[in-house]
Regions:
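Short acidic/polar active-site loop segments enriched in Thr and Asp
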Residues: 16, 62, 125, 185-186, ...
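Short, electropositive alpha-helical surface patch
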Residues: 113-125, 206
Length: 334
């Protein structure tokens, strides 16, 4: 089906192209009933204004650029949460003049490269990115160049900026506390690289729970960074075959949990008896594990919508202090 244009709407309604154009812009010289007829026809025909044309007329870049990491060659499964994020982006942009462009960031790529590329080539009027660091060069770069942006994740910089984040401190605290309440004493937290702010938030949350129960929780002993892991199944086997085998495990994702569970079971150990496992999840996949594993759900659909909403509000000049959201996880017991 051909793309609907102003001419298509004009032919459908019997009005002139000029009248159609003015009606879609809510022109004062067009009567309200005519506006309603034109807008109903535009919706029925699937009309969407050309963002480049709108940008030329208004001087506003109506493209939003989201920079998201992609998996490295050889990975069996991609990031389960990315599709949910993108769905949230598109849902929040519906009914606005803005369009979405997703720029991939390779695992070995300098995080500044796609940000610099988007800015230097004028690809967007606003930007979204994740995997924030405590001191993040991208934040300083966009702030200095006065480009509206919002991050999925926090920093510890003096620059105040819009963000949406999961309350990882709270999540890790609740997960670790749950394991300690179940009588577990030797807990491991599988975490993302220590380069990222949220990895530290998880550590501080788990350490807080440990101290409340009278245990130590140390980076060198209790945390396993997934940047050091090549095979989660082998890791699960190695952990449970050692003399200091853990009796509690907090997994950072569905994918890591899937491999670790297989490795644990390879050793003949039983989930729920020899070790308890909880995880951070983005979907209902853990309900299909054998056995099903309880998890703390991150709603990436909601995060995606909130990121776009914050960015559009920032583009319109809303103060940063109103555009900082911390979202708690929801516990799913299985």
């Amino acid at each position: 089906m051909a793309k609907a244009t102003l001419k298509t709407i004009a032919e459908y309604t019997g009005l002139s192209v000029t009248t159609v154009s003015r009606a879609l812009k809510d022109g004062d010289d067009v009567k309200q009933p005519t506006k309603e007829i034109v807008k109903a026809a535009a919706k029925k025909l699937g009309y969407r204004p050309n963002p480049s044309g709108v940008g030329l007329r208004t001087g506003i870049n109506y493209n939003i650029c989201a920079i998201l990491p992609v998996t490295k060659p050889g990975d069996i499964v991609g990031d389960v949460g990315s599709l949910a994020l993108i769905e949230g982006f598109t849902a929040a942009l519906k009914g606005t003049p803005y369009h979405l462009t997703v720029l991939p960031m390779a695992p070995d790529e300098d995080p500044m490269e796609p940000v610099r590329y988007a800015f230097e080539n004028n690809l967007c009027g606003g930007m979204i990115f994740n995997l924030t660091k405590t001191q993040d060069e991208r934040v300083a770069y966009l702030h200095d160049n006065e480009i509206p942006f919002v991050t999925f994740g926090q920093t510890e910089m003096s620059i105040e900026h819009p963000y949406v984040d999961i309350d990882n401190h709270d999540m890790a605290y609740r997960a670790a506390r749950q394991l300690y309440e179940q009588g577990r004493k030797n807990i491991r937290l599988l975490s993302s690289s220590h380069d990222y702010t949220y990895a530290w938030h998880k550590y501080y949350g788990a350490r807080r729970a440990a101290r409340e129960f009278g245990y130590d929780f140390e980076i060198e002993k209790n945390i396993i960074f997934d940047s050091d892991v090549d095979d989660y199944r082998k890791l699960g086997n190695k952990l449970m075959s050692g003399e200091q085998a853990p009796d509690g495990l907090i997994c950072g994702s569905e994918i890591s949990a899937c491999g670790l569970l297989a490795g644990i079971q390879d050793t003949g150990k039983t989930i729920g008896d020899d070790i308890d496992v909880v995880l951070v999840e983005t979907c209902d996949l853990p309900s299909f594990f054998m056995p099903p594993i309880s998890g703390y759900r991150q709603d990436f659909h909601q995060v995606g919508r909130k990121l776009i909403q914050h960015l559009l509000r920032r583009i319109n000049g809303e103060p940063v202090k109103h555009l900082q959201t911390l979202q708690k996880t929801v516990y799913y017991q299985r």
